[in-house]
């Protein structure tokens, strides 16, 4: 089936030319292209048109789950007759296994899986396994993490036909091989039950139940029924049942894997003994032998993913299978907000390996644990057939990949201008901000506020709540489904103000937002770079009254570049509006539930009562030293002292396995050293 785009709109402004150029590039065989599209110019609509034109299975990669959910919703609206799927991490909570030698502390893996997202992941893989070409998968960086191989998955697909002669017990064994669990009492997703000649299967990737009925050894009927009412939804002459888990294997491969694990265990014990580390040798012996016994008895063990190389039949160092392996070779990858997504992909491997190094070196895991990992960037890049990098601020990598040729989309079909930017002094910035909030709340408009740290976001939210302002916050400690719900609540008026740190920048489609307030805009650094400021300001570009207020005591180079670029785009849009007699019109977008969520709150709890702030356990955060413009006036001695202090902080963070913080300290050191060299 081909892609069929459904929309009441036609491409306008820069969109027709952008769609034409990107489509021609793909049909010409260009590997890499860049779509430079400003906020509100309809990049998603352009992407949908290109997908429909080239008719290829497509992976859309987003750098966070919230934006992935938003893209998923929009693509489902554009392609209601095609398979639009969602593939992100299914953890509501995840504490990875770790060991800190400085305190001799071992941290057991702890997690909570979201069953709804797990269903969507399995649905995405099932759609690709089905062989249909009209598949769009919207994914986070989870698409580069290891999973079972496509061959093993296909071998465990169960194909049945009405009228087929098939012994029921053989069918039940095949269900078990596909990791379905028999439960005749409570039929949950991924279970099956047997009642006489009828087998009900609660498919892991669907909300419905497949009912297969036998007459002797012949399949008499195949029906899909509602999981609650058991009303028949449809009948089938043939059906494919896909595995209930993304990691499946055969009994034969399990036996081979166990033998290989035993061989590698002997080698690792010998290695530790030869090094004089008898404690490590004993530790690895006890842990792995226990895991092997569990595999023999139950077919699995805790942390079985660390043995995935053996079950996949991979060599040491060979990359794991990932979602991309399930796509046909002639596919299309669209990397949204590429200036953030590409560096994120690059960083995944290093962080994973650093954590596992201690586990392997101290005898908690075999070296094979290193091979349960995300792809290296080079491996991901080698899997790309054709790619479109999408960003309002593409980075040097994307420009180099496309050989400097970019498709520009800066005209908004709605006629909306880039928001005006006003710089105000930081003195009394909170009082000034509250005045602006109250003005817009009276007009039923929404406000975004960005701070520099998570703690500042929480404290500002609490302050606003204490002054009877409907406010909430989102940051990285807030789980995915909570973030999605709070954004919908902001749009629907449950909240007037949303406070955040780094999650309010790229891609959020919030036409109700008329004001973006950037606190401490002059604190030069990652969160206040030219790209970050441009992206943050863009959140107000979907509202006819859009405005940005930067609170700062000086205008940094990044601020000036953002202001200048905004003025250039405003002039271009004004010229277009005048030529086509367009009056800027407010974007109206329906508010709908992106993913099924429970009645949960994100930061605040509103139920006809006073809102209460939900606190997260956030460690003390420091602003980057180099964010302070005073470093330009520091003496040579002061710079050397700062480098020394920051190096100590970096080592301490690395020792505590806080690699993100350590990387930030490393970047500070490099900038301090660069400043020192100029003295």
Where are the predicted features?
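Conserved pre-motif I regulatory segment
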Residues: 1-36
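Pre-Walker A (Motif I) flank of P-loop NTPase domains
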Residues: 28-34, 56-57, 133-135, 445-446
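Walker A/P-loop
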Residues: 28-50
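N-terminal cationic and glycine-rich segments that engage phosphates or anionic surfaces
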Residues: 34, 87-432, 436-442, 461, ...
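Conserved strand-helix element at the start of the C-terminal RecA-like helicase core
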Residues: 57-69, 86, 280, 440-462
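Conserved RecA-like helicase motor-core motifs
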Residues: 80-89, 303, 446-448, 460-482
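Conserved helicase motor "Helicase C" RecA-like lobe of SF1/SF2 P-loop NTPases
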Residues: 151, 453-475, 671, 675
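Conserved helicase ATPase core of P-loop NTP-dependent helicases/translocases
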Residues: 478-500
């Amino acid at each position: 089936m081909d892609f069929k785009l459904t929309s009441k709109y036609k491409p306008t402004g820069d969109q027709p030319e952008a769609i034409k150029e990107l489509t021609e590039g793909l049909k010409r065989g260009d590997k890499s292209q860049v779509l430079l599209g400003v906020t509100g110019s309809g990049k998603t609509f352009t992407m949908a048109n290109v997908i429909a034109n080239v008719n290829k299975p497509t992976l859309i990669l987003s750098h966070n789950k919230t934006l992935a959910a938003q893209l998923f919703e929009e693509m489902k609206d554009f392609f209601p007759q095609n398979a639009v799927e969602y593939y992100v991490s299914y953890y509501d909570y995840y504490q990875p296994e770790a060991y800190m030698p400085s305190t001799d502390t071992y941290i057991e893996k702890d997690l909570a899986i979201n069953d709804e997202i797990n269903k969507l992941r399995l649905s995405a893989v099932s759609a690709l396994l089905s062989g249909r070409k009209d598949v769009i998968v919207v994914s986070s960086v989870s698409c580069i993490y290891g999973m079972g191989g496509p061959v093993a998955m296909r071998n465990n697909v169960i194909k049945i036909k009405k009228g087929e002669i098939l012994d029921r017990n053989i069918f039940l064994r095949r269900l078990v091989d596909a990791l379905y669990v028999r439960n005749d009492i409570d039929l949950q997703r991924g279970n099956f039950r047997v009642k006489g000649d009828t087998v009900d299967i609660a498919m892991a990737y669907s909300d419905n139940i497949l009912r297969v009925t036998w007459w002797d050894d012949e399949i008499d009927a195949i029906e899909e029924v509602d999981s609650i009412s058991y009303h028949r939804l449809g009948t089938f002459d043939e059906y494919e049942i896909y595995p209930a888990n993304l990691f499946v294997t055969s009994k034969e491969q399990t036996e081979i894997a166990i033998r290989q694990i035993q061989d590698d265990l002997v080698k690792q014990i010998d290695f530790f003994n030869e090094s004089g580390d008898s404690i490590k040798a004993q530790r690895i012996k006890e842990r792995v032998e226990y895991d092997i016994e569990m595999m023999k008895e139950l077919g699995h063990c805790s942390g079985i993913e660390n043995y995935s190389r053996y079950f996949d039949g991979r060599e040491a160092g060979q990359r794991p299978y990932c979602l991309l392996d399930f796509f046909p070779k002639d596919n299309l990858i669209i990397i949204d907000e590429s200036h953030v997504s590409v560096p994120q992909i690059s960083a995944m491997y290093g962080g994973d390996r650093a954590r596992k190094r201690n586990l392997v070196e101290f005898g908690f895991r075999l070296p094979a644990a290193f091979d349960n990992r995300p792809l290296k960037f080079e491996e991901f890049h080698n899997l790309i057939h054709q790619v479109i990098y999408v960003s309002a601020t593409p980075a040097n990598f994307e420009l180099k990949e496309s050989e400097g040729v970019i498709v520009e989309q800066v005209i908004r079909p709605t006629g909306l201008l880039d928001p005006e930017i006003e710089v105000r002094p930081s003195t009394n910035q909170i009082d000034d901000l509250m005045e602006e909030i109250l003005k817009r709340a009276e007009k039923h408009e929404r406000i975004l506020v960005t701070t520099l740290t998570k703690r500042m976001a929480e404290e500002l939210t609490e302050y606003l709540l204490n002054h009877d302002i409907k406010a909430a916050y989102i940051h990285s400690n807030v789980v995915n489904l909570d973030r999605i719900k709070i954004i919908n609540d902001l749009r629907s008026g449950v909240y007037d103000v949303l406070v955040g740190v780094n999650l309010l920048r790229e891609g959020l489609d919030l036409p109700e937002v008329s004001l973006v307030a950037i606190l401490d805009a002059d604190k030069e650094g990652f969160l206040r770079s030219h790209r970050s400021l441009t992206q943050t300001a863009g959140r107000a570009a979907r509202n006819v009254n859009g405005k940005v207020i930067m609170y700062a005591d000086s205008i940094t180079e990044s601020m000036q570049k953002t202001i200048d670029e905004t003025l250039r785009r405003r002039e271009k849009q004004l010229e277009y509006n005048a030529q086509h007699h367009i009056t800027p019109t407010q974007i109206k977008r329906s508010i709908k539930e992106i993913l099924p969520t429970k009645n949960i709150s994100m930061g605040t709890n509103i139920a006809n009562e006073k809102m209460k702030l939900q606190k997260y356990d956030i460690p003390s955060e420091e602003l980057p030293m180099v964010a302070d413009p005073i470093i330009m006036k520091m003496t040579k001695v002061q710079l050397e002292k700062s480098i020394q202090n920051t190096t100590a902080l970096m080592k301490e963070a690395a020792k505590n396995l806080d690699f993100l913080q350590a990387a930030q300290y490393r970047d500070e050191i490099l900038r301090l050293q660069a400043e020192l060299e100029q003295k």
